[in-house]
Amino acid sequence: MDWATTLGTLSGGIGLFLLGMSMMTDGLKLAAGPALERVLASGTRTRWHALGSGVLVTGVVQSSSAVTVATIGFVNAGLLGLGGALWVLFGANVGTTMTGWIVALLGMKFKIEALSLPLIGVGVVLRLTGTAQRRGALGTALAGFGLLFLGIAMLQTAFAGLAERVALPQDRTALSVVSQLGVGVVLTVAMQSSSAAMTIALAAAQGGLLSPHGAAAVVIGANIGT
């Protein structure tokens, strides 16, 4: 691929991934409905219950921000103590890594184009035929999941092309590590999503543009930037 095609594929892949993640998050939150509030309200009796609730709810709705806002609302309403809220937030930060695990276990090991297009098709059918709000929301989430995987496939293609033209530092010097941390921070701040930055790092490592250690530094930077 030439430079124009590579950069176009890269920007399109990032756009599809962000759009898919947004649709998946919004759809899952609508499908969950008041379950988010019920789990947070009833699952914070002990610190371990609170931690588990944070992990579970964030893993389902794929948005630690939504869990954080709901938790703060419960604290302000006097339904949840500050100690329990802190453990919920700890769990939310663990649960938000679910996207990275999904990408690493599925998106990097299978031919995801074959999975993404059927998901988009089924999701659109559910969205258009869903008379109930929950069914339509589930369709939106499935279509978003498919777009997310399609974006990852485009990122892999783009980074494989970049790896043939660009040679990034592969050493483990302090300067290289700090620069890779900075890349992770900047990506997260620019896209307002540590999950997106994490996925870009994984795709870059898969395409040979980054070493595993470099990708790990970018992921750590993404978690700092969040």
Predicted features and spans:
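Short helix-coil transition sites and intra-membrane helix breaks within transmembrane domains
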Residues: 25-29, 58-66, 159-160, 187-196, ...
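Transmembrane helix-loop junctions at the membrane interface of multipass transporters and ion channels
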Residues: 97, 101-111, 126-130, 160, ...
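C-terminal ends of transmembrane helices
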Residues: 21-30, 71-78, 122-134
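Residue-level signature of catalytic and energy-coupling elements of molecular machines
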Residues: 20, 62, 94, 151, ...
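A structural-propensity feature for long, helix-poor, extended segments
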Residues: 106-137, 141
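Membrane-interfacial helix-loop connectors
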Residues: 69-93, 101-116, 120, 188-225
